[in-house]
Amino acid sequence: MTLADPALPRPRLILASASPRRFDLLSGAGLSPDAVEPTHIDEHEIPGELPGPLALRLAQEKAMAHPGSDDAFILAADTVVGVGRRILPKTETEAEARRCLDLLSGRNHRVFTGIAARGPDNRFAARVVETRVKFKRLSQPEIDAYIASGEWRGKAGGYAIQGRAGCFVINLIGSFTGVVGLPLYETANLLTGLGYPVTARMGEGGSA
């Protein structure tokens, strides 16, 4: 018998992230987490580390930091914005956010979201998803208004594409949900590969 067998209780899905955006994305796809249990790790980059490998490493470390459960799948993720080899911060101050927006204005950048999952049998899978985004050239009043909104706080690269900053995007190649914080297509494939009943959950409409 398999985990997807209707005779067996459905395994739980634990989101090892405090991000409300990731919770909402999963819920909207019919994959509402049964619990939110963030893990805490050192998120500083290693000297010389590139944006993509950083996102993947942090997602893996978050998933492995969870104690696990014999009836649950653990899902973790991390998003990193990069301009070339440069890693942009998750902005906490207006000055940081302003520097990020000045740098992104009129330029292409890349958003990397690492995803990692562990099954009840401790099987593990992870990958990183890259999306290319181009911003319009931002005027000073636009930057000032965005800073005043506070939407940038705690966001990778100092912006939230699903909010006001969506008006800044000229072009996007890749996963929109990956930029928001969790690439749904790749996440569903990752969980399915580990034995989580993704399709059955979608049929439930996300009900637990």
Swiss-Prot record:
Cofactor(s) required for function per UniProt: a divalent metal cation
EC number: 3.6.1.9
Reaction equation(s) it catalyzes: dTTP + H2O = dTMP + diphosphate + H(+); UTP + H2O = UMP + diphosphate + H(+)
GO molecular function: dTTP diphosphatase activity; UTP diphosphatase activity
Swiss-Prot/TrEMBL GO biological process terms: nucleotide metabolic process
Keyword Protein biosynthesis: no
Site features described as Important for substrate specificity, chain residue numbers: 21, 79, 162
Pfam families: Maf (PF02545)
Subcellular location: Cytoplasm
Predominant subcellular localization, coarse grouping: cytoplasm
GO CC term, one of those recorded: cytoplasm
Active-site positions on this chain: 78 (proton acceptor)
Record's signal peptide: none
Superkingdom assignment: Bacteria
Enzyme superclass (EC): hydrolase
Keywords per UniProt: Cytoplasm, Hydrolase, Nucleotide metabolism
Family: Belongs to the Maf family. YhdE subfamily.
Function: Nucleoside triphosphate pyrophosphatase that hydrolyzes dTTP and UTP. May have a dual role in cell division arrest and in preventing the incorporation of modified nucleotides into cellular nucleic acids.
Database matches in HAMAP family: Maf (MF_00528)
Protein name: dTTP/UTP pyrophosphatase
Organism, scientific name: Maricaulis maris (strain MCS10) (Caulobacter maris)
Organism classification: Bacteria, Pseudomonadati, Pseudomonadota, Alphaproteobacteria, Maricaulales
